[in-house]
Amino acid sequence: RRNEVRNMSLELSKKAAAVKPSSTLAITAKAKELKAQGKDVVGFGAGEPDFNTPENICEAAIKAIKDGFTKYTPASGTNELKAAISKKFKEFNGLDYDTDQIVISNGGKHSLTNIFTALINPGDEVIIPAPFWLSYPEIVKLAGGVPVIVTTTKEQNFKLTAEDLAAAVTDKTKALVLNTPNNPTGMLYTEEELRAIAKVAVEKDFYVVADEMYEMLVYGEQKHISIASLGKDIYDRTITCSGLAKSYAMTGWRIGYTGSSKEIAKMMGSVQSHQTSNPNSIAQKAAVEALTGPQDSVEKMHAEFDKRRKYMYKRICDMDLLDALEPMGAFYVFVDGSAVLGKSYKGTKIESVPQMADILINEY
């Protein structure tokens, strides 16, 4: 009896146990392991620029350290950085967010954690179009929500349609996660597509969590459009989420930010004050320089990403049994390996694309 009681008291969280480990990190670890063995491997797992953070941003951080800017800041970030983000929202996104509508976090994942903690009650549903960034459903589950996956197809350019969205809505729907430019497909929603989605969100009355982390990485004649900029009704229902990790090669600095209603921002700030307190003070100073300083390094990185995009897309499409849609944003190419399924390699039948990838990385 005592043992039974003791074992019950040591039981771990069912909520945490339901969360799946990150397969992205597993892929990255596999690539590093093979590199350590001396094999020539290029890791395509983690969404991380291979450039160093621009020098002017690093110098701003060094100055912050030397100036003693190493104390606590307000939990939701400094007014200086909020003002810089507010200006960026206005000029780049066409969005008016005052500083009290902005919450600065410890990276994009933290922003999403804040958002879903603030929005979700147990059992609330969050619609997530697939393919999706792997952390979305896990963060929703940790907040007590239920991920509702809506599969998109290659024929749809892997983009959610208003019709499919409306069909997925129930009386428990609390929010839609809309990621554009998209990780992992590289697809970009047009204004027409966004307006149709916004119409459903307004009519059915749910929030839109607009993950726009790759907003500055758009190619060709395409243009990034923020769904919150398409009218007051959708603006009021949207939490716009972005950060500096991808565009400024600052993945390790951990600065993300959101724009939302004052009510939601206040609640997210309160949540963050108890979970982590403020974002790194030095990284906040660096972020101010990133947003307000010279942008030439960003433009050079963008040009190099575009060059790689074209190269990767052509190489994949030239390979037998592989195909892809041309990515319009971010720095991903979503490979279609379905033609390989059912074929055999050294007597082993290939039944999934991950299995094919495992064979390639181990055999070649």
Located regions from the model:
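PLP-dependent class I/II
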Residues: 3-12, 20-22, 27-30, 34-41, ...
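Substrate/cofactor-recognition hotspot
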Residues: 16
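Acidic/polar N-terminal loop/beta-strand segments that form early-domain functional surfaces
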Residues: 46-49, 75
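Glycine-rich phosphate-binding segment of PLP-dependent enzymes
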Residues: 53-72, 86, 91
